[in-house]
């Protein structure tokens, strides 16, 4: 377990480079199982979730390493289709292995996936999609067993535009006979990045980024593939919010400004001035943010649920009253009570939080309940008067590569301790 000590009251000022996207890297790592040659992934973030995915790949017989932001993977000698329970139950992204394992071996076995406890996140859409492709899916003694020696293309209508289900179906359908069309598909940039990678392998994916994706089943080409992971829009949004909550001024490089439109819009509403250029962005913020009247989390291109906690932290010191509605997950306000320990004023019922901004927060001992909530605690600590201690800070490592070091380089004073 790790803890973080934040000394508040320092503005975030300077330049930072945005890392590769966690939510793009994880499904792409899974997709290397259906490559027919070595794969090199650049801008691959060094995160605990990425390390766990590499451990799963190694357990299946895949050769892989991650050094200096580049992952090297060769799945030529992969021979197992049963994922280790000890690892797969720790991270939700282990579910991404089902599609590629089915496509390559005709069989996949895993435990129910783990991850942050942020509400009910059913995997029924994943399993329903695989069944539509012809897989037999059953549960035995807490394990998910999928079998399908010959997957067949199908028309699949998703009840909800689930990112993970869309990605799993894409990977399995790439290896199936015939054409698969996914309707009501997720439109997130990470979907498009996975499609680009699959196309680079030699598969045929069209329509990614829209609500209808077509996958023409076939074989990958026998070749080496190099792919660059897209920039992480949530890391970018978190750093932008760090500048906004401290009244700072920040320049971000390696950022795709098209992917963060909804985040930038809310920070502009809070009073920040944002200018964008080719692969870069500059944000300059007032000493205290304005209220953000209403924010509702939505699937892309709406405001991302993965930025809700960070925006909540910003609203706690805003001039006026802000309202946030969490439409994606029903249990994603656990950070609210922790912010209350720091002096935040709010009421929360069901999916709606009404936040009344206070002049300043006060440092306190708080707990990170999940990845993004931990990031929100860190942001709140930056603006608070005095010192803030965040317990279970290791959860932040699931989505940020040494976030405390990045912020320290921008003027923060943060000390991390391993307990």
Indicate residue ranges for each PLM-predicted region.
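Short, structured segments at the rim of ligand-binding sites
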Residues: 1-419
């Amino acid at each position: 377990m790790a803890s973080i000590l934040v000394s508040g009251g320092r503005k975030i000022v300077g330049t930072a480079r945005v890392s590769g996207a966690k939510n793009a890297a994880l499904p792409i790592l899974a997709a290397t199982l259906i490559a027919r040659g070595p794969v090199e992934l650049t801008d691959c973030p060094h995160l605990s979730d990425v390390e766990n995915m590499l451990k799963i790949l190694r357990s299946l017989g895949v050769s892989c390493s991650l050094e200096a932001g580049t992952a090297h993977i060769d799945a030529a000698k992969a021979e197992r289709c049963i994922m280790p329970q000890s690892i797969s139950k720790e991270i939700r992204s282990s579910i991404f292995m089902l599609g590629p394992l089915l496509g390559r071996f005709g069989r996949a076995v895993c435990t129910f996936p783990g991850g942050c406890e942020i509400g009910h996140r059913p995997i029924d859409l994943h399993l329903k999609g695989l069944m539509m492709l012809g897989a037999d899916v059953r549960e035995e003694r807490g394990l998910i067993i999928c079998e399908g020696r010959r997957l067949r293309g199908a028309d699949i209508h998703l009840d909800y535009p689930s990112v993970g289900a869309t990605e799993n179906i894409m990977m399995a359908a790439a290896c199936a006979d015939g054409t698969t069309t996914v309707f009501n598909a997720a439109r997130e940039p990470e979907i498009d990045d996975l499609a680009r990678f699959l196309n680079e392998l030699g598969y045929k994916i069209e329509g990614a980024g829209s609500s209808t994706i077509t996958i023409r089943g076939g074989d990958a080409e026998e070749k080496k593939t190099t792919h660059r992971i897209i920039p992480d829009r949530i890391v970018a949004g978190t750093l932008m919010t760090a500048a906004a909550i401290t009244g700072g001024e920040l320049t971000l490089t390696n950022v795709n400004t098209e992917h963060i439109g909804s985040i930038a819009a809310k920070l502009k509403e809070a009073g920040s001035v944002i200018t964008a250029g080719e692969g870069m962005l500059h944000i300059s913020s007032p000493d205290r943010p304005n209220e953000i009247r209403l924010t509702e989390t939505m699937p892309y291109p709406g405001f991302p649920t993965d930025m809700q906690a960070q925006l909540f932290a910003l609203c706690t010191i805003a001039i006026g009253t802000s309202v946030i509605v969490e439409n994606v997950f029903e249990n994603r306000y656990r950070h609210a009570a922790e912010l209350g320990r720091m002096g935040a004023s709010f009421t929360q019922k069901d999916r709606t939080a009404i936040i009344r901004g206070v002049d300043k927060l006060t440092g306190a001992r708080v707990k990170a309940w999940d990845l993004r909530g931990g990031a929100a605690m860190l942001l709140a600590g930056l603006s608070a008067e005095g010192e803030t201690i965040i317990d279970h800070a290791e959860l932040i490592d699931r989505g940020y590569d040494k976030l405390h070091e990045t912020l320290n380089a921008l003027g923060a004073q943060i000390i991390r301790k391993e307990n």
